[in-house]
């Protein structure tokens, strides 16, 4: 297993696998909802896009793939990066998907514009392992990287708002935001 995501409304978990397929499981009944073989490369990242009935997944063949999780039909497939896709984040309200890659970049994709790349964020010096939107400011997101940093960005800006040197000797494998409203 390479990645995992939980559906926001259904009792489902999405699992992305080294074997090149994805599986959706019902964690209440412990039964498989769907299995979709995608490619011969590991699938490292995946997310539900519940408002569209989609899953979006990224793999080691550099492609971003989108499938309808109810029918299993492919919506689209395209080369998103020239290297492995490590992480995916879905914007909470806008038609945006972020991808983080071993090519040292984060890209912002717009599915309402035929999956056009709206922006490429550069500045990391190693593999981008994780991306996450800020639930309290959805114009902002963070990226975590093996260059020991977390960068916080704003959509539409070419440079990060700031960079945190997270570790002296270890890379950053995961970033996330606190989702509840009881803290700033």
Predicted regions and their residues:
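Beta-strand-rich domains and repeat architectures in extracellular enzymes and scaffolds
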Residues: 1-20
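WD40-repeat beta-propellers
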Residues: 4, 22-26, 64-68, 88, ...
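Loop/turn segments within WD40 beta-propeller blades
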Residues: 5-10, 46-52, 89-95, 113, ...
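WD40/WD-repeat beta-propeller blade-loop signature
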Residues: 9, 32, 42, 51, ...
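Conserved strand-to-loop turn within each blade of WD40 beta-propeller repeats
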Residues: 16-19, 58-61, 93, 99-103, ...
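Beta-propeller domains
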Residues: 17-33
């Amino acid at each position: 297993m390479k990645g995992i995501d939980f559906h926001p409304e259904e009792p489902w978990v999405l699992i992305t696998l080294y074997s090149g397929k994805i599986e959706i499981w019902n964690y209440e009944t412990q039964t498989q909802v769907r299995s979709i073989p995608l490619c011969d490369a590991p699938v490292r990242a995946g997310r539900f896009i519940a408002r569209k009935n989609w899953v979006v997944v990224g793999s080691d063949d550099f492609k971003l793939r989108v499938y309808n999780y109810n029918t299993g039909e492919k919506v689209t497939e395209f080369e998103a990066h020239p290297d492995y896709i490590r992480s995916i984040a879905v914007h909470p309200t806008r038609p945006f998907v972020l991808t983080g890659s071993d090519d040292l970049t984060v890209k912002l994709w717009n599915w309402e514009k035929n999956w056009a790349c709206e922006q490429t964020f550069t500045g990391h010096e190693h593999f981008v392992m994780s991306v996450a939107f800020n639930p309290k400011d959805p114009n902002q997101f963070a990226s975590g990287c093996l260059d020991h940093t977390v960068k916080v960005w704003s959509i539409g800006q070419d440079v990060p708002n700031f960079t945190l040197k997270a570790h002296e000797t270890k890379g950053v494998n995961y970033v996330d935001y606190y989702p509840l409203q009881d803290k700033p």
